[in-house]
């Protein structure tokens, strides 16, 4: 293939022909034989049942483990944690996220416990089906990212015999009599025992990643160990999602992608696409403007989302690059032997404009392993580029060689693809609305804007919400009082007080 010398790094001009090789297959999201189910999201894989009947109020209790003696439930203050910043400089300037919640142990009958423990762990795993060089024995590599442990109760530690170290507890009235039921360090009587936990998570930790050849995952794991030798341990696990969000102080992320170039003094083109940071499932505007300076005839306009995936292991000494994925987002073609610009808006002579909208693939495409958001983890690197392809014909062009009849201009612009949870409704401060359970938060934020609007309307309805603030008309008039003192009077009195104090 003939590639001429390029004048700049943005655009690449080369002849197009039906027999051109070296192109990756194009993924047409609208022409697939099987479409992914929009109701299936990457964040709904693990279902955790709710825990009802607990006295201690929390956002939502989720059941982790249960047996004939007790059950363990957990409530998270925030079901999703956001780590702002993408580059090292942005991460250092941001504050840490905080993982906090409550752990409840509900006892059904008197039991002796040895230890109550909660662990927060983060792990990464990359798959290598062909084997890791040089020996090719290992087919995967797993690393530990973090491991933090809270020991709420231990039989060897001295704690209160009634609460057993819990911040809140409630014993059934039948077992409240200490004369008939003497207290001991290990014995837990039927009731509820709540333990709070809190952990700051630095923004330097990687976000949660889920691909076919690698993943990064975090989870909370509980351990309730009984004192008896033959009574097993009760364990439970709940996943925690860490989402990478844009930096709050960065202005460059909201700037649009704008490319303005000229080619051979025959064509001047301007392409503007959305923003440099786009959210999965978001609809972004696209604007095209072409100025014909010579005899140029347009035939096709296409917009691609290019995804590149790299996997590393053995301290980044081994690398594997997957085939670049081309997702066709937008396409406009002209009929045979006609010009594409004939249907466009003509601003001035030989100046044409087109404005349209493009939908970015959503999280249901991510669940189908079609696309994934950008990552910052060194061992799993995923980057994206918006590629604009302009196909046209031009007479007497030096780039046309052989049987090629058309020319194509490739315009590559880097873009950062964010998770669908990074919509404005998730990253901005919440409205005054009822508490939304964690099961509803697991849905994609963009697909549930209608639900969010319903909750917002419900919050503003004073007939439904009894805690709504009163209207301005319901306030009674305040009786007249003396006006506040002047600033000079306060300053003089303060100065005289200081002088008297100095004299003393």
UniProtKB/Swiss-Prot annotation:
Protein's GO biological process: clathrin-dependent endocytosis; ubiquitin-dependent endocytosis
Cellular component per GO, a single term: cytosol
Pfam families linked: Arrestin_C (PF02752), Arrestin_N (PF00339)
InterPro entries reported for this sequence: Arrestin-like_C, Arrestin-like_N, Arrestin_C-like, Arrestin_domain-protein, Ig_E-set
Chain positions covered by the region annotation Disordered: 481-504
GO molecular function, one term: ubiquitin protein ligase binding
UniProt function note: May regulate endocytosis in response to extracellular stimuli.
Similarity field: Belongs to the ALY1 family.
Protein name, as recorded: Putative arrestin-related trafficking adapter SPBC839.02
